[in-house]
């Protein structure tokens, strides 16, 4: 890289990151793209249902609740969440305050302060997997809620146009949607929980909620259910059985099936300034390249569902949390 280009990159990064202090840090772009394909894989197991069809979650974590003061410096208030199951519906009422340590908010790249929210969501207890996908997040609707009552919103409102000079972390007017976690050109001020704060004070996760996973006892020797998706299917953290329909198989870290695009568009902003992975459009689903489908999920057995159920995973690589759901809404 020549000296002139190197200086341009440094100046561009400084100006963009400084501007972030004054921008509205919005999340959940409605311009995100996802190549949707039908997942035709099935499992053959005598104790499993088919890979498409209905399941029941009515006996699982229906009375999960938490109500404790969080003395983390940037919180200093009570975290409250209550889950309940009635009839065919799972309900959550929470104040959106995390139950674990958080980073410093406001911070130089996220000017917002954590505050209590009104969280009230419902999910079916009998989710039905389909062959189609539905994009979620941001204006499309809540993708899922972690058990502590904090919402999942993996996308951002940041974007760039086709040039190298016009990017915003908040207005979502460009053709290229900026990722929060898979790049280091832009900073959205996320903490060690892969979370930050929206202008309304809403703390939310873009990726693995490390503090909550730790509180749940998550590690390489256990599957850890951490959230419910909008379609009613469960979301697990990081680890799953190496053989999807065999609970006696070793646990392994689940890998997504998203890869960097193989062909770069001529109108994409310079890769020298914005490396592959910076934008949502830099990723494509390659069936069979990982363990999971286009919604970062699969059908298989879990500790809570020994007969098998479709379920999602939070992963350490893109898409981190799924951007779509496979169940009926």
Model-derived regions: residue spans:
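Solvent-exposed N-terminal domain segments of exported/luminal and surface proteins
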Residues: 32-43, 47-187, 191
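Short loop/beta submotifs within extracellular cysteine-rich repeat domains
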Residues: 131, 211-216, 318-323
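Extracellular/lumenal glycan-associated surfaces
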Residues: 123, 148-150, 199-212, 305-319
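Core of folded catalytic or high-affinity ligand/protein-binding domains
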Residues: 157, 170-216, 222, 230
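Bacterial N-terminal signal peptides that target proteins for export
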Residues: 3-16
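C-terminal motif of bacterial Sec signal peptides marking the signal peptidase cleavage site
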Residues: 23-26
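A mature extracytoplasmic/lumenal domain signature
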Residues: 127, 156-158, 207-209, 239-241, ...
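Extended, compositionally biased non-globular segments
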Residues: 231-233, 238, 242-329
């Amino acid at each position: 890289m020549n000296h002139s280009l190197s200086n341009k990159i440094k100046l561009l990064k400084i100006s963009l990151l400084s501007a972030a202090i004054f921008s509205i840090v919005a999340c959940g772009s409605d311009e995100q793209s996802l190549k949707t394909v039908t997942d035709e894989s099935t499992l053959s197991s005598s104790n499993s249902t088919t890979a498409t069809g209905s399941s029941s979650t009515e006996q699982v974590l229906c009375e999960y609740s938490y109500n404790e003061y969080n003395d983390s410096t940037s919180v200093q208030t009570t975290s409250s969440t209550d889950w309940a199951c009635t009839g065919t519906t799972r309900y959550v009422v929470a104040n959106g305050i995390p139950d674990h340590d958080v980073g410093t908010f406001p911070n130089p790249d996220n000017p917002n302060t954590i505050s209590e929210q009104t969280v009230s969501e419902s999910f079916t207890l009998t989710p039905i997997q389909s062959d189609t996908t539905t994009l979620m997040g941001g204006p499309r609707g809540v993708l899922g809620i972690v058990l502590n009552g904090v919402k999942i919103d993996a996308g951002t409102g940041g974007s760039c146009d086709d040039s190298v000079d016009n990017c915003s972390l908040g207005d979502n007017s460009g053709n290229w949607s900026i990722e929060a976690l898979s790049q280091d050109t832009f900073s959205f001020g996320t903490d060690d929980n892969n979370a930050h704060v929206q202008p309304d004070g809403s703390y939310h996760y873009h990726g693995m909620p490390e503090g909550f996973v730790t509180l749940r006892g998550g590690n390489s020797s256990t599957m850890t259910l951490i959230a419910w998706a909008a379609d009613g299917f469960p979301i697990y953290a990081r680890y799953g059985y190496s053989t999807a329909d065999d609970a006696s198989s070793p646990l392994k870290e689940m890998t997504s099936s998203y890869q960097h695009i193989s062909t770069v568009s001529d109108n994409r902003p310079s890769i020298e300034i914005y490396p592959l992975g910076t934008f949502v459009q830099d990723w494509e689903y390659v069936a069979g390249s990982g363990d999971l489908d286009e919604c970062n999920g699969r059908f298989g057995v879990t500790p809570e569902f020994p007969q098998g159920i479709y379920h999602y995973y939070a992963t350490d690589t893109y898409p981190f949390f799924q951007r779509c759901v496979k169940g009926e809404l």
